[in-house]
Each structure stands twice: as C-alpha cells, then as structure tokens.
Amino acid sequence: MAVLTDEQIDAAMPDLDGWERADGALRRSIKFPSFLDGIDAVRRVAEHAESKDHHPDIDIRWRTVTFALVTHSEGGITQNDVDMARDINGIVGS
C-alpha cells in the first residue's frame, strides 16, 4: 500500500472529524466521561482493528484516549489509516 501524498491527506481531513495530522500520523484525542468509558472504547476499537489487521497506537491518560494512525511498514499515512480513522469515528462517535 502506497503512502498518501500531502494533497491526498489534506483532501481526506474534512471527512475525519476530530482528527489532526501531527508528527507524520493521524491523531485524535477523546475525553470520555469516565476512565472505564475510555477503556470500553479502546476495547471496541481494538476488536475492530484486530479484524482489519490494522492497529492504531493507543495512549490512555485517565479519561483521555489518543489514537494515532500511521502505517509503520510503509513509513507514512496510507489509505488504511484514513479508513481506520473513519471507522474509529463510527465506533466512538465523531
């Protein structure tokens, strides 16, 4: 899978509510009502990611969960990352 160009990534961003492009990855931080709500969201995203064999980096800080997407094997953001960002929005809400 090819790394997307800057133009392709910029074109995808308006459809990725809550996501930003930072440090070569797509990132979204979400503050949940409680720690356990955040953990539940991580579990749901993890199950979906496992089924797609495309796994986000996930950072958990009390009620704030940050998802980061980059295809490490390709060295950048690919269509799989854009698709997974959309999927995560569908799972946790945009």
UniProtKB/Swiss-Prot annotation:
Family recorded in the similarity comment: Belongs to the pterin-4-alpha-carbinolamine dehydratase family.
Name under which the protein is recorded: Putative pterin-4-alpha-carbinolamine dehydratase
Domain of life: Bacteria
Record's catalysed reaction(s): (4aS,6R)-4a-hydroxy-L-erythro-5,6,7,8-tetrahydrobiopterin = (6R)-L-erythro-6,7-dihydrobiopterin + H2O
Annotated EC: 4.2.1.96
Disulfide topology: none
Cited InterPro entries: PCD_sf, Pterin_deHydtase
SUPFAM superfamilies assigned to the protein according to its UniProt record, in alphabetical order: PCD-like
UniProt entry keywords in alphabetical sequence: Lyase
Keyword Lyase: yes
GO terms of biological process kind: tetrahydrobiopterin biosynthetic process
Molecular-function GO terms, alphabetical: 4-alpha-hydroxytetrahydrobiopterin dehydratase activity
Leader peptide range in chain numbering: none
This protein's record includes keyword Lyase: yes
Pfam families: Pterin_4a
